[in-house]
């Protein structure tokens, strides 16, 4: 009997659930980066040219800083032996404070900023409650 499929190849597609299961088993390829302040973070091997600010210092992981590995053998293909560049210091902004800890407002009894004038939930109708639950 002749095959009804128009394709002459004998390739069968791997089901998506099997593909996901295989992808979950792969180890996460990431690089540990230690900051001068003593903190460290992990950067995914495929994530580059993105920066962030930590304790007032901007850090950027560019493609020049990467070591590329094959199959988990941990031997570098490419290494950049340049001296590390100093991180870029951000200029102080109008809303930044010299303190590293930001104080929180004290709790108080009274109207909230979100629902001013709301004294009791007992005064709400069922349609009001249904609306609030839908948010």
Swiss-Prot record:
Q: Highest taxon of the source?
A: Viruses
Question: Where along the sequence does the record place the motif called Nuclear localization signal?
Answer: 17-32
Segments of this protein annotated with the region Disordered = 77-109
Q: How is it modified after translation?
A: Phosphorylated.
Q: Name one GO biological process term.
A: symbiont-mediated suppression of host innate immune response
Q: Which Pfam families match?
A: Gemini_AL2 (PF01440)
GO MF annotations in UniProt: DNA binding; structural molecule activity; zinc ion binding
GO-annotated cellular components: host cell cytoplasm; host cell nucleus; viral capsid
Zinc finger regions, unnamed = 37-54
Query: InterPro entries in the record, alphabetically?
Result: Gemini_AL2 (IPR000942)
Looking at the record, which segments are called Transactivation? 120-135
Q: Where is this chain's protein located in or outside the cell? A: Host nucleus; Host cytoplasm
**UniProt keyword annotations, A-Z:** Activator, DNA-binding, Host cytoplasm, Host nucleus, Host-virus interaction, Inhibition of host innate immune response by virus, Metal-binding, Phosphoprotein, Suppressor of RNA silencing, Viral immunoevasion, Zinc, Zinc-finger
**How does it associate, per the subunit comment?**
Monomer. Homodimer. Homooligomer. Self-interaction correlates with nuclear localization and efficient activation of transcription. Monomers suppress local silencing by interacting with and inactivating host adenosine kinase 2 (ADK2) in the cytoplasm. Interacts with and inhibits host SNF1 kinase. Binds to ssDNA.
Quote the entry's note on domains: The zinc finger and the transactivation region are involved in PTGS suppression.
Protein family membership: Belongs to the geminiviridae transcriptional activator protein family.
> What does this chain do?
Strong activator of the late viral genes promoters. Acts as a suppressor of RNA-mediated gene silencing, also known as post-transcriptional gene silencing (PTGS), a mechanism of plant viral defense that limits the accumulation of viral RNAs. TrAP suppresses the host RNA silencing by inhibiting adenosine kinase 2 (ADK2), a kinase involved in a general methylation pathway. Also suppresses the host basal defense by interacting with and inhibiting SNF1 kinase, a key regulator of cell metabolism implicated in innate antiviral defense. Determines pathogenicity.
Q: What is this protein called?
A: Transcriptional activator protein
* Species per Swiss-Prot/TrEMBL record: Tomato leaf curl virus (strain Australia) (ToLCV)
